């Protein structure tokens, strides 16, 4: 058998195998994995036996790719097995564990991750917990004995938007839950030293030195990777200006720390040339660079992104440390394979793709022999090229790209990297002495002022928020190939033709609707409600999902991506049925992200610039009729009972959205507008509360389907069993977003189509599966 000689193609083959797992709805069975492993072994033996050749080289690549697939699938199966046993969901469980990472504190709760050390039953090694209404302030490394109520990681599933279940799997979170009560500590549960305790102390010192605000939050992110104070509005600002990569500690900052470490040792050798006789300078500088990067990465919390950066730096320095000449692509694939061997599920995170994608582009553009170029070209072209190169990745993960990013980063990258970050590193060195570090923190804050003004200006530019649908796999691959062609070296034939491969990115995933048709979507927003209605040329949103006490909401995380996914850049009309946080929580962030033609609300003055939602209003869009059935102008605002009730009727059917009205208003609607209530689809009132969706109302509406918008295992037990029984007696099919994810239904001229459930249509192997309750 021939000796194995490393080639960059081997690394790409292994990466391709691990990434092949991502689009699968189910993991391969154990038997299938065994067969694939055997095939890979046979292929490897055949490839590296006898004389070499192109066919055997290709066979070797196939074997390596299969090994990558089998390895990633085995780790994925193990991660899934480490999730909470379903039988323990909703039960009180006693456990002990260490606080891991930086706790997030707000007025109502403390949220943190816990590494378990003991428990009455077999439990996940890592879980995410909330502690409500507590005066306790746990610190990193504290060991706590607790009684907790847990559930398996379960997020919202829509056609686009944030995927918590993917994030939980990538972070090895096996359960989420809340703390019922704390128990007295025991001797086997002792606090441990944790670097996060140091980070928390530094964050406290920054709090004392600087006033609250975005600049202080940015300094924490840059200095110690602490993004707890950065709210959704700030993240939106950073995304719109294309500067997200600068805010939390990134590969760029760790790389700068490595460069400073190597540079300081170079200075030492310059001052004492005789050191080179004992230890060669290149190797010493490489070791110093790596050690400095390690220290900085640890201060940043040693998160997965910083771990990837350290591995990449080590791979890039491998040639120096081993005194071997290694090409850029060899070093790149060494880093790629090392990262994937350490964590084959790293491709679940956007950071993996963005960091390796950016480095690949830089090698493609500048890895060949360097040629002198004008300064403007040497600085501007990489920024423009990087924006184009990362466009498919940005759309795949965020459905958004900032066309202002190249301009902003031309100024922001050198300003932050070479001015702000070195000052922050100095402040970190001086942090044990508050009287010395405080002025340095304040200096950095003052210098961040121009950067903050720049991103605010950039975020207001017309093309700063360019949203597009999340690309299909085919469109994504075509775009990557097109970009490789477009950014090929000078002299490559027909480089401009690569732009045509980007055109599929512009295509909406949802088909155009004919006159008289409409699409009804009940988005998965947890314990809240948001209903999207789309006609041939118009879009209506009824309610904006829940907001949270810490200031976050689902406008950014769910609604904006869902609208971008169907190619909607703005809303023609927004109706906020009433002022409760679970229906109106996402309004502010949605107004910040999208243009909205008109806003209606039932609560006077609740939304600036909104019109009052009033009974009797009718309008027609593209052959589809809309009508407000409640509230009348004579009714004072009564909270739930003043909810806007919206009826939609098209050529293929009709739907009713009653908000949170109860049986009293239902009875009034039956008496006064009974002839308008007969519809095909009813969104259950008040999420399935026992005080709504009465038997009389169901008899008047006669729905074929009833949809519930509710949170998974919600504390209200919505939909209540009595409501489910009423709907069953009425003969309607029942669908619940808590079980099925977002629900989509087309009303076409030929009739009402079969509903589509996101937890089935968008299923990936890390998603929890659920059977439709009450569905045929």
Can you name each region flagged by the protein language model?
Residues 243-264, 569-593, 682-696:
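Di-metal (Zn2+ and/or Mg2+/Mn2+) metal-binding site signature of metallo-dependent hydrolases
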Residues 666-742:
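Cap/insert and terminal regions of metallo-dependent hydrolase folds
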């Amino acid at each position: 058998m021939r000796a194995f000689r490393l080639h960059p193609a081997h690394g790409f083959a292994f990466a391709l195998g691990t990434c092949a797992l991502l689009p699968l709805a189910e993991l391969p069975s154990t038997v299938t994995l065994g067969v694939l492993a055997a095939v890979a072994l046979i292929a490897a033996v055949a490839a590296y036996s006898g004389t070499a050749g192109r066919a055997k080289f290709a066979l070797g690549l196939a074997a390596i790719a299969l090994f990558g697939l089998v390895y990633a699938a085995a780790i994925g199966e193990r991660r899934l097995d480490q999730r909470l046993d379903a039988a323990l969901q909703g039960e009180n469980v006693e456990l002990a564990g260490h606080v891991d990472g930086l706790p997030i504190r707000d007025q109502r709760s403390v949220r943190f991750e816990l590494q378990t050390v003991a428990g009455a039953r077999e439990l996940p090694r890592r879980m995410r917990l909330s502690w409500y209404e507590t005066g306790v302030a746990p610190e990193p490394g504290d060991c706590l004995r607790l009684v907790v109520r847990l559930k398996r990681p379960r997020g919202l599933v829509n056609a686009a938007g944030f995927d918590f279940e993917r994030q939980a799997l990538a972070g090895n979170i096996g359960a989420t839950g809340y703390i019922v009560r704390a128990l007295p500590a025991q001797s086997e549960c002792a606090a441990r030293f944790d670097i996060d305790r140091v980070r928390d102390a530094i964050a406290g010192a920054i709090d004392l030195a600087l006033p609250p605000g975005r600049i202080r939050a940015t300094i924490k992110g840059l200095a110690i990777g602490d993004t707890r104070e950065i709210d959704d509005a700030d993240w939106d600002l950073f995304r719109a200006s294309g500067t997200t990569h600068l805010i939390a500690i990134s590969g760029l900052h760790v790389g700068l720390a490595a460069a400073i470490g190597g540079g300081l040792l170079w200075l030492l050798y310059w001052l004492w040339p005789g050191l080179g006789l004992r230890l060669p300078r290149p190797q010493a500088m490489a070791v110093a660079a790596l050690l400095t990067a390690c220290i900085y990465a640890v201060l940043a919390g040693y998160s997965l992104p910083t771990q990837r950066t350290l591995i990449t730096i080590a791979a890039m320095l491998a040639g120096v440390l081993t005194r071997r000449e290694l090409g850029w692509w060899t070093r790149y694939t060494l880093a790629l394979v090392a990262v994937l061997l350490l964590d084959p599920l790293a491709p679940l995170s956007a950071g993996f793709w963005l960091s390796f994608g950016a480095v690949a582009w830089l090698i493609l553009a500048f890895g060949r022999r360097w040629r002198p170029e004008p300064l403007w070209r040497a600085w501007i072209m990489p920024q423009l090229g990087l924006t184009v190169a990362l466009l498919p990745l940005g759309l795949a993960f965020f459905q958004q790209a900032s066309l202002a990013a190249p301009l902003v980063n031309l100024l922001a990258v050198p300003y932050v990297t070479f001015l702000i970050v070195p000052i922050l590193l100095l402040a970190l060195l001086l942090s044990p002495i508050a009287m010395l570090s405080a002025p340095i923190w304040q200096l950095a804050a003052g210098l961040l002022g121009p950067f903050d003004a720049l991103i605010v200006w950039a975020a207001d530019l017309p093309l700063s928020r360019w949203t597009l649908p999340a690309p299909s796999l085919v469109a994504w691959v075509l775009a990557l190939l097109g970009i490789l062609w477009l950014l090929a070296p000078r002299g490559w034939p027909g480089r401009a033709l690569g732009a045509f491969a980007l055109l599929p990115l512009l295509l909406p995933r949802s088909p155009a609707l004919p006159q008289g048709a409409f699409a009804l979507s009940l988005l998965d927003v947890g314990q809240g409600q948001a209903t999207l209605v789309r006609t041939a040329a118009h879009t209506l949103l009824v309610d904006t999902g829940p907001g949270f006490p810490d200031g976050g909401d689902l406008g950014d995380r769910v609604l904006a991506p869902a609208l971008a996914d169907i190619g909607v850049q703005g809303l023609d009309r927004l109706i906020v049925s009433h002022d409760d946080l679970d229906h109106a929580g996402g309004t502010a962030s949605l107004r910040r992200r999208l243009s909205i033609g008109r806003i209606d609300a039932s609560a006077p003055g609740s939304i600036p610039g909104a019109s009052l939602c009033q009974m009797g209003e009718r309008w027609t869009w593209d052959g589809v009729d809309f009508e407000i059935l409640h509230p009348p102008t004579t009714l004072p605002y009564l909270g739930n009972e003043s909810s806007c009730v919206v009826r939609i009727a098209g050529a293929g059917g009709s739907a009713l959205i009653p908000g949170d009205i109860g049986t009293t208003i239902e009875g009034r609607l039956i008496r006064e507008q009974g002839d308008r209530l007969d519809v095909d689809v009813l969104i259950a009132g008040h999420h399935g509360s026992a005080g709504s969706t009465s038997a009389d109302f169901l008899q008047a509406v006669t729905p074929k389907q009833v949809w519930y918008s509710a949170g998974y295992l919600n504390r209200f037990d919505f939909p209540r069993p009595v409501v489910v029984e009423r709907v069953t007696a009425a003969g309607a099919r029942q669908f619940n977003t808590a079980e099925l994810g977002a629900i989509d239904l087309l009303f076409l001229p030929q009739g009402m189509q079969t509903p589509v459930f996101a937890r089935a249509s968008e299923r990936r192997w890390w998603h929890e599966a659920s059977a439709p309750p009450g569905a045929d």
